[in-house]
C-alpha cells in the first residue's frame, strides 16, 4: 500500500534496552499520527499542511507513548516529557526540567522526551528566538531532535550521548552532499557541540 505501518520491531528492541538512568529522546509522532489517522479514516487529512502536521503530531504522540509502554520492562515507569525551545532558553524552566530528569532514576522511571510539535508554532518560535538574539543572548533553537538530545545531554551532564540516525553524517552545506562530514569529535560534549555549530555556520 501507499502508506506503511510503524516498525514495531525497532521500537520493541529499543524499548527493551531502556533502564532507569537512561534518557530517551524520541521522534516520529507526526509520521505515526499520519499513519494512525489514515488507518482509521482511509485517507490523509486535507487542507493546510502546517495545521495537518500539528494534528498528526497530537494524534501520534499518544500512539508513540502507548507503544513504548507496551515494550518497556513493566518494572519501570515511563514518563512523557514534551519540550519546546523556551525550556532551554529560560533559566527557571531549564532548572525545573533538569531537576525532574535527575529524579527519574531514583524513582525507577525512564523519561521519554519529544519536541512538542502539536502546539509549537514555527512563526512564534522564530520571533522568540530572534528576540533572544537581539538582546545579545545565545538562543537554543531546537531545530530537530538531535539538537534537543544534545541539549538534554548537556543539561543532565550525561556521560554518553548516542544519536541513532539513518544519515551518514553532518552536511556543512545542506545543499551540497559532497560537504558530508562523517566524524566530529571533542574532549567533552560542550566542545563537541561547539564544533558542530562551527560546521553549520
Where are the model-predicted features located?
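Nucleotide/pyrophosphate-binding catalytic subdomain
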Residues: 1-201
Amino acid at each position: 500500500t501507499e502508506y506503511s505501518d510503524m516498525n514495531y520491531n525497532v521500537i520493541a528492541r529499543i524499548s527493551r534496552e531502556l533502564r532507569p538512568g537512561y534518557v530517551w529522546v524520541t521522534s516520529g509522532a507526526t509520521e505515526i499520527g499520519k499513519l494512525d489517522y489514515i488507518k482509521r479514516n482511509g485517507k490523509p487529512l486535507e487542507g493546510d499542511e502546517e495545521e495537518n502536521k500539528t494534528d498528526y503530531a497530537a494524534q501520534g504522540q499518544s500512539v508513540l507513548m502507548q507503544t513504548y509502554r507496551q515494550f518497556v520492562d513493566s518494572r519501570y515507569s515511563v514518563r512523557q516529557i514534551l519540550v519546546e525551545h523556551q525550556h532551554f532558553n529560560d533559566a527557571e524552566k531549564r532548572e525545573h526540567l533538569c531537576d525532574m530528569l535527575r529524579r527519574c532514576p531514583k524513582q525507577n522511571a525512564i523519561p521519554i522526551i519529544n519536541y512538542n510539535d502539536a502546539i509549537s508554532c514555527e512563526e512564534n518560535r522564530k520571533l522568540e528566538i530572534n528576540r533572544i538574539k537581539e538582546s545579545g543572548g545565545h538562543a537554543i533553537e531546537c531545530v530537530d531532535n538531535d539538537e534537543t538530545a544534545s541539549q538534554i545531554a548537556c543539561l543532565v551532564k550525561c556521560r554518553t550521548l548516542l544519536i541513532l540516525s539513518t544519515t551518514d553524517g553532518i552536511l556543512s552545506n545542506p545543499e551540497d552532499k559532497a560537504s558530508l562530514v562523517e566524524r566530529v569529535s571533542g574532549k567533552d560534549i560542550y566542545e563537541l557541540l561547539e564544533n558542530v555549530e562551527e560546521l553549520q555556520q
